Amino acid sequence: MPKMKTDKGVAKRFKKTANGFKRKQAHLRHILTKKSTKRKRHLRAKCLVAKSDVPAIARQLPYA
């Protein structure tokens, strides 16, 4: 049986941890002037992928 391929786009965006998959939050790329400093600071924090999305991410990262 051939090796399963890793989805490289997913591999660059998510990291496997003991608690699930770590990801970066959205809304911090552009149009930042109207967002408050507090909002931007909170968006810098990493967060975990939602429980319902974990199986899909795990399928795309077979060796994670």
Swiss-Prot record:
InterPro entries: Ribosomal_bL35, Ribosomal_bL35-like, Ribosomal_bL35_CS, Ribosomal_bL35_sf. Pfam families: Ribosomal_L35p (PF01632). Keywords: Ribonucleoprotein, Ribosomal protein. One of its GO terms (molecular function) is structural constituent of ribosome. GO terms for biological process: translation. The keyword Nucleus does not apply. Belongs to the bacterial ribosomal protein bL35 family. This is Large ribosomal subunit protein bL35. The gene is rpmI.
